[in-house]
Each structure stands twice: as C-alpha cells, then as structure tokens.
Amino acid sequence: MRYIKSEPYYEGLPPFNVSGSPFNVVPIHNYPELMKDTCALINAEWPRSETARMRSLEASCDSLPCSLVLTTEGMCRVIAHLKLSPINSKKKACFVESVVVDKRHRGQGFGKLIMKFAEDYCRVVLDLKTIYLSTIDQDGFYERIGYEYCAPITMYGPRHCELPSLQNAKKKYMKKVL
C-alpha cells in the first residue's frame, strides 16, 4: 500500500510503498479532480442528486468530516470510498459511512484495505479511540475485520445519547476500539 504524504498530514502513518502496491488512499479534499468519479461511484450504489453528493464530498477536510478514496497508481481511477463523520455525543469517536467498492473490484480485498487505512488515520491523525458504523447486510465483513455489535447510536444530539433498541430495524450497529 502506498500512502500519499502531505506533511504533516500523514505524519506517523505507515511508510510509503511498503508492499509496492499500485494503489493509493487519499483524502478527497486534497484531490478535487477525483470528486466527479467518486460521486459516480457512490451514486451507483445509493442514487442521490449529483449536486447533493458533490456538496457532501466538498465538505471533506483535514479533521471531520473526511472522505477517503482508494485509487490506482497515478490517481487514474477511484476504486473505493468511505466517509468519516463526527459523532456529537462521542468526542473521541467517529462514524464511518458510505463505504463502497466499485462493483468490478469487489471480493479483492479493497474494502479491507480502505477500512484499515481509515482506522490508522483515525488513530494516528485524528487521535480517535473508537469507530462506529451501521450496516444492513455487511455485518459479516465487518466482524471479520474486528468490529463488534453495539447499541444504536445517534450522530446528533447531546453527549452520551444512545437510541433505544429498535428490534425490527434492519440496520445493525457496530464499533471497533482502536
């Protein structure tokens, strides 16, 4: 995995070209030229207006929210995306959402790769302790990479606010302590 470094942005993250991999993980706000392709990738999975999606991507910053993309060497093609969002009720945590891998590249380890980078980024750059997420049908994947089931949480509202258990809800909430 090769990490693009922009001092001191990635200071402390794993070294460059450790595996000689032809892939990069980068924050989208440092590479605005990737936003249109990223928008198309996300909208292929969860359709939404291009304007709304682009506004969400343009909100990415060095802290939270931050959208990360996995690209080919030379930034030619976006393969995967995820977004890290703040949780108002948990200051040392974030919520990962919009995790998507291009359909042509699923089952090749790219989801695991971008999640691992996001965990490192959260721990080293953002000094966060826990990552939360929700999923409808990918809980097996998240379990395999170390996530555990937890009570539903809200990204908004007062500190330490948890939602009551929703027995019939399809969403499953998970977390990983970093």
UniProtKB/Swiss-Prot annotation:
Keywords: Acyltransferase, Transferase. Transmembrane segments: none annotated. Changing residue 97 to A/Q: Does not affect acetyltransferase activity. Substrate binds at residues 48, 53-56, 88, 98, 134. GO terms for molecular function: acetyl-CoA binding; protein-N-terminal amino-acid acetyltransferase activity. Residues 26-178 form the N-acetyltransferase domain. Its EC number is 2.3.1.-. Belongs to the acetyltransferase family. This is N-alpha-acetyltransferase 80. The gene is Naa80.
